[in-house]
């Protein structure tokens, strides 16, 4: 028996498809999402509707974004969900979530079992729309969830941690074994809740500057910041900000990265592109 086939659909490697089939896990995720009628619920990657069906049962309308043409067609003819669904057959990386929120007249509640091969770039895409999003619940590779929630002074702490925590409160929900999927992935999975901050705890003047600093620092994470960020900050400047130049990227808090970004915005702003 081909373990890549589930409900008559062959899981496609190029789309990173692993289909959730464990009823206990599905019920736990739906309980965590807690969908309510009247909310602008949006599912990314509904696949074979493991989450779509129990969430859709509670709603009058549900928006789904599915790249796979065959799966989108199956959803259109779903026996009891079809009439409730608005289906976008496209890559979620190309979706303008700000426009979708304006169309639906309220902030979005986004959820999904995300393809692991695009989960990190998709996170960054969604972060740019957090003013249009109420919350997000995602199944991800456990290692990615560990990176999202990691704090300074840990190996998992990186650029994704800083940017996620800049935009959102990040809350791990539950861990999921490979046996909950068809085909079983080679890694453990986990569900995470991301809630955009109502008020930014560490507002930055130019998000591009924060992005640049974190990229340069973590691309050379074994170097001290006097070296990795030496082209942006002098030792004296770092010391004046109360930041030890001998620290490495993983030792610097989100608040300190934001402090550095604001200093640079005020003293060496990026040119408009």
UniProtKB/Swiss-Prot annotation:
Acetylation keyword on record: no
E.C. code: 2.1.1.182
Main location as per UniProt: cytoplasm
GO CC term, one of those recorded: cytosol
SMART domains hit by this protein: rADc
GO terms of molecular function: 16S rRNA (adenine(1518)-N(6)/adenine(1519)-N(6))-dimethyltransferase activity; RNA binding
Subcellular location: Cytoplasm
Catalysed reaction equations from the record: adenosine(1518)/adenosine(1519) in 16S rRNA + 4 S-adenosyl-L-methionine = N(6)-dimethyladenosine(1518)/N(6)-dimethyladenosine(1519) in 16S rRNA + 4 S-adenosyl-L-homocysteine + 4 H(+)
Keywords for the protein's UniProt record, in alphabetical order: Cytoplasm, Methyltransferase, RNA-binding, rRNA processing, S-adenosyl-L-methionine, Transferase
Gene3D superfamilies: Ribosomal RNA adenine dimethylase-like, domain 2, Vaccinia Virus protein VP39
InterPro entries found in the cross-reference section: KsgA/Erm, rRNA_Ade_diMease-like_C, rRNA_Ade_Mease_Trfase_CS, rRNA_Ade_methylase_Trfase_N, rRNA_adenine_dimethylase, SAM-dependent_MTases_sf
Pfam families according to UniProt: RrnaAD (PF00398)
Key word S-adenosyl-L-methionine present: yes
Top-level EC class as recorded in UniProt: transferase
Family matches, as SUPFAM superfamilies: S-adenosyl-L-methionine-dependent methyltransferases
Binding of S-adenosyl-L-methionine, residues: 18, 20, 45, 66, 91, 113
Protein family according to the UniProt entry: Belongs to the class I-like SAM-binding methyltransferase superfamily. rRNA adenine N(6)-methyltransferase family. RsmA subfamily.
Biological role stated in the UniProt entry: Specifically dimethylates two adjacent adenosines (A1518 and A1519) in the loop of a conserved hairpin near the 3'-end of 16S rRNA in the 30S particle. May play a critical role in biogenesis of 30S subunits.
Protein's UniProt name: Ribosomal RNA small subunit methyltransferase A
Chain's gene name: rsmA
């Amino acid at each position: 028996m081909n373990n890549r086939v589930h409900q008559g659909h062959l899981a496609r490697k190029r789309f990173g498809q692993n289909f959730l089939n464990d009823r206990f896990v599905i019920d736990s995720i739906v309980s965590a999402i807690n969908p309510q009628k009247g909310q602008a619920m949006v599912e990314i990657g509904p696949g074979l509707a493991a989450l779509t069906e129990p969430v859709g049962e509670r709603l009058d309308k549900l928006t789904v974004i599915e790249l796979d043409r065959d799966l989108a067609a199956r959803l259109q003819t779903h026996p009891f969900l079809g009439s409730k669904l608005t289906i976008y057959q496209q890559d979620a990386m190309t979706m303008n979530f700000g426009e979708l929120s304006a169309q639906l007249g309220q902030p979005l509640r986004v959820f999904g079992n995300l393809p692991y091969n695009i989960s990190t770039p998709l996170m960054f895409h969604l972060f740019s729309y957090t003013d249009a999003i109420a919350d997000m619940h995602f199944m991800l590779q456990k290692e990615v969830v560990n990176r999202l929630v990691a704090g300074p002074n840990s190996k998992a702490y990186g650029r994704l941690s800083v940017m996620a925590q800049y935009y959102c409160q990040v809350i791990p929900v539950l861990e999921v074994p490979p046996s909950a999927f068809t085909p079983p992935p080679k890694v453990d999975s986990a569900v995470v809740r991301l809630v955009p901050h109502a008020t930014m705890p560490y507002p930055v003047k130019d998000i591009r500057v924060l992005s640049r600093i974190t990229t340069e620092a973590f691309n050379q994470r074994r170097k001290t910041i006097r070296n990795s960020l030496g082209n942006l900050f002098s030792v004296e400047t770092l010391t004046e900000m109360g930041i030890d130049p001998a620290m490495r990227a993983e030792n610097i808090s989100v608040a300190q990265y934001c402090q550095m970004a604001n200093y640079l915005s005020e003293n060496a702003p990026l040119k408009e592109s």
